[in-house]
C-alpha cells in the first residue's frame, strides 16, 4: 500500500504543477516540484521491475507496447481529431493534425496537440523499459548482473544527457530530445530498482535522524545552488550542472518515501488512494482535458448569465492557449478545483472506457490505465 500512496502523491504533485500547485502547499518550498516530479514517477516504475522479465524479452516488450505505446498513440489520434473539431469553433490550440503530428511527433516531442501534452513521458519511459531489460540480459550473459554496475552505468548515461543539453541547448529538438529524455530517465528508473533490490531492507533509520539528514542536504542545495527546478519536457534550465538534478531527485524521493510509509497506517487500504494510484497513466495523459472541462463550465456560465457570472472570463485566451486558467476574483484557491478536475475527469474517462472495452473485449489495451 505504501507505493500505491506514493503513486497517488506523485501524480498529484505532477498535476498540481500544471495548475498553480493546486492552490496548496506540499513541502514545495523545501522540495520544488520540478526538481523531482518526473524522477519520482519513473522511480516508482523502476521499483516494480522484475528480473523475471529477462526470461522472455519479446513478451515483455510486447507487454510494454500494449501498456504504454498503443494507448498513447490512440489518444494522440483522438486529440488530433479533437483539435480539428474545436478548430471549427475558433479554437487555435494545438498543431495541424497531419500524418507527421499524428504518428511521428509523439515520439520526438509529444506535445503537438497540447490537450495530451502530458503523454510525452510515455515514449522515453517505453525506451527506458526496453533498454533496461536488454542491458540487464546482456549483463546476465556475461555474468555481471549487479545492481551497482547498472546504477553506475545509468548515472553516467543520464549525466551525459544533461550535459549535452547544457552545452548544446539549441540542439535539443526532434529525435535528440527523445534521446536525452530517455538518458535522463534511466538513472531514475534504476533508483527504483536499486531501492527495492538493495536498500529497502536496510531502510530502518529512525524518523528523526532520517528527516534530519534529508532536510540538511536539501538546505545545502537550496542555499548554494541556483534555481533547483528544471524543465524535463523541453529538457532545459539545468542551471546546476549534471549532478545536482539527481541529488535533488534523491532527497525528494527519500522524503516522500518515508512520508508515505508513515501515512499508510492512518490511511489503510483506502479505495480513494487506490482509485488515483491505479489511474496514473490516464491522469497523466488527460489532465489538461480535465482543466479544459472546468474552463468550459466557467465559459458556459458566463454566456448563460450574459456576463453576470464570470464576466471577466477571457474567451480569446481560452480558445488560443492551453495554459489560460480563469481564477474567479484572481483567487489562487480556485487552483485546487482545477486540480480536482485534472485528477477526476481523467479517472472518469478511464472508468467509462474500461467498462466499454470490457464489454467489447475483456483484454482491452486500456484496462487499468
Please provide the spans of the model-predicted regions.
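Alpha-helical transmembrane segments and their immediate juxtamembrane cytosolic regions
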Residues: 1-369
Amino acid at each position: 500500500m505504501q507505493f500505491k500512496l506514493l503513486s497517488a502523491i506523485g501524480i498529484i504533485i505532477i498535476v498540481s504543477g500544471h495548475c498553480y500547485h493546486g492552490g496548496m502547499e506540499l513541502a514545495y518550498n523545501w522540495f520544488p516540484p520540478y526538481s523531482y516530479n518526473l524522477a519520482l514517477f519513473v522511480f516508482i516504475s523502476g521499483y516494480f521491475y522484475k528480473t523475471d522479465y529477462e526470461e522472455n524479452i519479446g513478451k515483455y516488450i510486447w507487454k510494454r507496447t500494449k501498456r504504454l505505446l498503443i494507448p498513447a498513440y490512440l489518444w494522440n489520434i483522438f486529440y488530433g481529431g479533437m483539435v480539428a473539431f474545436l478548430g471549427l469553433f475558433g479554437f487555435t490550440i494545438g498543431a495541424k493534425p497531419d500524418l507527421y503530428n499524428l504518428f511521428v511527433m509523439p515520439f520526438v516531442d509529444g506535445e503537438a496537440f497540447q490537450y495530451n501534452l502530458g503523454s510525452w513521458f510515455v515514449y522515453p519511459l517505453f525506451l527506458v523499459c526496453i533498454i533496461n531489460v536488454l542491458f540487464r540480459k546482456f549483463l546476465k550473459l556475461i555474468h555481471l548482473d549487479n545492481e551497482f554496475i547498472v546504477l553506475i552505468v545509468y548515472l553516467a548515461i543520464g549525466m551525459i544527457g544533461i550535459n549535452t543539453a547544457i552545452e548544446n541547448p539549441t540542439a535539443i529538438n526532434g529525435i535528440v530530445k527523445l534521446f536525452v529524455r530517455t538518458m535522463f530517465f534511466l538513472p531514475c528508473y534504476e533508483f527504483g530498482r536499486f531501492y527495492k533490490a538493495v536498500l529497502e531492507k536496510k531502510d530502518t533509520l529512525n524518523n528523526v535522524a532520517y528527516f534530519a539528514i534529508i532536510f540538511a542536504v536539501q538546505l545545502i542545495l537550496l542555499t548554494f545552488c541556483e534555481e533547483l527546478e528544471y524543465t524535463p519536457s523541453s529538457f532545459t534550465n539545468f542551471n546546476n550542472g549534471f549532478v545536482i538534478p539527481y541529488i535533488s531527485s534523491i532527497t525528494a524521493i527519500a522524503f516522500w518515501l518515508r512520508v508515505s510509509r508513515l501515512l499508510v497506517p492512518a490511511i489503510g487500504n483506502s479505495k480513494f488512494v487506490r482509485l488515483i494510484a491505479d489511474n496514473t497513466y490516464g491522469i497523466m495523459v488527460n489532465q489538461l482535458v480535465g482543466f479544459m472541462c472546468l474552463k468550459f463550465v466557467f465559459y458556459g456560465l458566463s454566456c448563460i448569465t450574459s456576463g453576470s457570472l464570470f464576466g471577466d472570463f477571457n474567451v480569446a485566451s481560452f480558445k488560443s492557449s492551453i495554459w489560460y486558467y480563469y481564477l474567479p476574483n484572481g483567487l489562487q484557491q480556485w487552483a485546487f478545483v482545477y486540480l480536482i478536475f485534472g485528477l477526476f475527469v481523467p479517472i472518469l474517462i478511464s472508468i467509462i472506457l474500461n467498462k466499454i472495452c470490457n464489454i467489447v473485449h475483456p483484454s482491452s489495451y486500456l484496462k487499468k490505465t
